[in-house]
């Protein structure tokens, strides 16, 4: 794995196949626009976490020498190797380097150390579209039209390059500080046979275009039926995303992935009464079970999609110069000082990155003491009353920081459990009727051991190197769980 970035040399050789299946060798070389630099983590000051994935984190990072702020994607080499994700990482890097469009996130440079790979991406200070939907409850039709038009404009370019994104959703639609959309996260991208993107022979997302990737709520029925991927996959996800903008929730939301898939296959979709006729019609067409009938995928291509009545009044030639909708601020930022630099806030345990990154931050902000951290977690955490029944599951000296009745979701079923976060640190889930421990998660000082991903206000996933556990909190406190666990990690 140490040689991974070395393969991203300034010159690449591509072995290609002809469309008729005969093996034809062809050479193609190009220079990377985003170079591999000799930077180290010590060259940056780290701030808040933008997002967490199964093998990566994206964090706000300021380059000390220039003051430039990036969204630094930090990928765990060990996990990438173990989970056979090398090809995905290479392909994302190669694709981002070659895409040039105002609606697509930019890659500036890469570097690596002994434990991690780094991609310095454009920092979108407006956050995720998902956050705007959550803060506003739902978007107005004018807001949804503006954002959808910008996504359509970027998708048209992506598809013209012979690429399928395969993970279009509100979380992957980022907003600039002035409110324009940028499509991000090309970790699931699929080059088509006639793609204009140059790739390495060993940098392909998968050999079979029907391989399941993406996010359950946005997956089209043809993928569930193992049909090859097409541009129509992204258009289905666009329809789901537009529905979510206008309603506040995804169209096929259910208690488990299995139930979501059943609703997708059955096309079990209900339109709220407040949807306009034009919005309802566009979503209905984008969610056609036949991929080739979706607007944008047929013989007329994106011309048919852009002329749909929902987009009446959209100036397609000047999208990026139009005034975007006003962004709803992060409620947490309302209590912060306006002069506060995020780079010095939101302390993040970075001891797993580089050789001794924690040392470099000592001069910037002292980490909170154990008592301070425990106190802040306790204020966040004890959201359900604690009774003596749960004491039997604790070790001597161990205390409960957060506890709640939740559902543990599996593919087909869900089970009620009592989820307990302790100061060990440890997570325990208990069968509340039998008072039997069903499992526990203990993690070390390495924050890569455990990541929390919020998928909706009530749903969250706890990811470890060995497994991913999905939970539903009926009181919609998924973000509270995430904050409590991450605060404990950063103690």
UniProtKB/Swiss-Prot annotation:
It catalyses: L-seryl-[protein] + ATP = O-phospho-L-seryl-[protein] + ADP + H(+); L-threonyl-[protein] + ATP = O-phospho-L-threonyl-[protein] + ADP + H(+). Residues 365-376 have a biased composition (Low complexity). Changing residue 276 to A: Abolishes autophosphorylation. It is an enzyme of class 2 (transferase). SUPFAM superfamilies: PH domain-like, Protein kinase-like (PK-like). One of its GO terms (biological process) is positive regulation of protein kinase activity. Phosphorylation on Thr-211 in the activation loop is required for full activity. PDK1 itself can autophosphorylate Thr-211, leading to its own activation. Residues 321-377 are annotated as: Disordered. Residues 44-311 form the Protein kinase domain. It holds the Pfam family PH_3. Activated by phosphatidic acid (PA) and in response to the fungal elicitor xylanase. This is 3-phosphoinositide-dependent protein kinase 1. The lineage of its organism: Eukaryota, Viridiplantae, Streptophyta, Embryophyta, Tracheophyta.
């Amino acid at each position: 794995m140490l040689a991974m970035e070395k393969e991203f040399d300034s010159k690449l050789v591509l072995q290609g196949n002809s469309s008729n299946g005969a093996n034809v060798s062809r050479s193609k070389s190009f220079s990377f626009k985003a170079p591999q630099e000799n930077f180290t983590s010590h060259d940056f000051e780290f701030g808040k976490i933008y997002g967490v994935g199964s093998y990566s984190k994206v964090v706000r990072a300021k380059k000390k020498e220039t003051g430039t702020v990036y969204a630094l994607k930090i990928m765990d080499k060990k996990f990438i190797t173990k989970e056979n994700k090398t090809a995905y990482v290479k392909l994302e890097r190669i694709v981002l380097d070659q895409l040039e469009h105002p609606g697509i996130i930019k890659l500036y440079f890469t570097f690596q150390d002994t434990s991690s790979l780094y991609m310095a991406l454009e920092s979108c200070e407006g956050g995720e579209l998902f956050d705007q939907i959550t803060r506003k409850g739902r978007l107005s039709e004018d807001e949804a039209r503006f954002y959808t038009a910008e996504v359509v404009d970027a998708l048209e370019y992506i598809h013209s390059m012979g690429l399928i994104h395969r993970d279009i959703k509100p979380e992957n639609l980022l907003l600039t500080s002035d409110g324009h959309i940028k499509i991000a996260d090309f970790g699931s991208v699929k080059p088509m046979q006639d793609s204009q993107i140059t790739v390495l022979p060993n940098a392909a997302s998968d050999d079979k275009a029907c391989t399941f990737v993406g996010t359950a709520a946005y997956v089209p029925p043809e993928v569930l039926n193992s049909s090859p991927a097409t541009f129509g996959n992204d258009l289905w996800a666009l329809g789901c995303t537009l529905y979510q903008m206008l309603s506040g929730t995804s169209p096929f939301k259910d208690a488990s992935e299995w139930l979501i898939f059943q609703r997708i296959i059955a096309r079990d979709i209900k339109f709220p009464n407040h949807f306009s006729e034009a919005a309802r019609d566009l979503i209905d067409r984008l969610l056609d079970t036949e991929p080739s009938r979706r607007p944008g995928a047929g013989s007329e291509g994106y011309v048919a999609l852009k002329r749909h009545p929902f987009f009446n009044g959209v100036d397609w030639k000047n999208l990026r110069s139009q005034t975007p909708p006003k962004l709803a601020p992060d409620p947490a930022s309302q209590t912060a000082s306006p002069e506060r630099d995020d780079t010095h806030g939101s302390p993040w345990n970075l001891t797993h990155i580089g050789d001794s990154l924690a040392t470099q931050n000592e001069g910037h902000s002292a980490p909170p003491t154990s008592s301070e951290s425990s106190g802040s977690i306790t204020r966040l955490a004890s959201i359900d009353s604690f009774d003596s029944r749960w004491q039997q599951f604790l070790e001597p000296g161990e205390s409960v920081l957060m506890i709640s009745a939740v559902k543990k979701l599996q593919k087909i079923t869900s089970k009620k459990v009592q989820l307990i976060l302790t100061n060990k640190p440890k997570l325990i889930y208990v069968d509340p009727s039998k008072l039997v421990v069903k499992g526990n998660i203990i993690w070390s000082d390495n924050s890569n051991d455990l990541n929390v991903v919020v998928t909706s206000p009530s749903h969250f996933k706890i990811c470890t190197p060995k497994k991913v556990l999905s939970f539903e909190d009926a009181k919609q406190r998924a973000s509270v769980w995430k904050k409590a666990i991450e605060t404990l990690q950063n103690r």
